[in-house]
Amino acid sequence: MPRTARNNNMRSNGASIEVAGVIGTGASKTRKKMRDIERLLKKDTLPAHVRVENERALKALGVELQNTQHNLKAKQNAKKYHMVRFFEKKKAIRKLKQARKTLEDTASTEVRKDIKKARKVVKHSEVDIIYVMLFPKTEKYISLYPNPKEDDKTELSKNPKAKKGMQMTEERKRELRKQAERLLDENKLPFSIDDVLQGKTIRLDDTQNHAVLTEEIDAPSKKYNDEEEKEDDFFE
């Protein structure tokens, strides 16, 4: 085999190896590799098998970039909304404990109407906890217990755009609460509510949809790798 042909084959065969070396290195390097491949694909003289190989590599890198951006956004939101979720979780736990105590006391009276009402309050409180625990980390956190000020109400009445934004926020909150309630009704929660009430720290693995008893909301906020954040500055 002529040396030139052999070298061409080596370069084409090495494309997948080069892509593998980019996986997990961050969004900046992934985007750079994608631009390199896109420039290569613009060449009219590119052999068919090399073109196919690089088109596949480009698609794979596109998926990798999406995953990297998703994880980065989740990390940033976890840090940004750590305290508000921490306090709302504590408040939701307190409300559920009170609701369960009320149900227990009401059950002893044997008044069916009161018992039914108490059960609804318990379920509502359980949904609150699920909402806080499973709120998508890639989204801006929507508070369960907001404290609207008079100035805010006045601003909403004067600003149609702000009012529409608030309506969309409330709609999203209702949607997420319905999802939480559905998981509760279908017994598909990735964690135990009793574990939450007992103070066990739960880290949720979003990719695998299961829970691991380790640090999560209750853990102190950690400092993230500055170099990684500087490199992956897509959301800054």
Swiss-Prot record:
List each coiled-coil range: 53-110, 161-189
Q: Which parts of this chain are annotated as the region Disordered?
A: 146-176, 204-236
Q: Tell me the keywords, alphabetical order.
A: Coiled coil, Nucleus, rRNA processing
GO cellular component assignments: nucleolus; preribosome, small subunit precursor
Tagged with keyword Coiled coil: yes
Main localization is nucleus
**What's an example GO BP annotation here?**
maturation of SSU-rRNA from tricistronic rRNA transcript (SSU-rRNA, 5.8S rRNA, LSU-rRNA)
Give residue spans, biased composition: Acidic residues.
226-236
* Keyword Flavoprotein carried by entry: no
Kindly list the places in or outside the cell where this protein is found, as annotated in its UniProt entry.
Nucleus, Nucleolus
**Bias type Basic and acidic residues, positions:** 148-158
Pfam families, sorted: Efg1 (PF10153)
State the family named in the UniProt similarity comment for this chain.
Answer: Belongs to the EFG1 family.
Q: Which PANTHER family match?
A: RRNA-PROCESSING PROTEIN EFG1 (PTHR33911:SF1)
This chain's function reads: Involved in rRNA processing.
| UniProt name for this protein | rRNA-processing protein EFG1
Organism, scientific name: Debaryomyces hansenii (strain ATCC 36239 / CBS 767 / BCRC 21394 / JCM 1990 / NBRC 0083 / IGC 2968)
> Per UniProt, what is the name of the gene that codes for the protein in this document?
EFG1
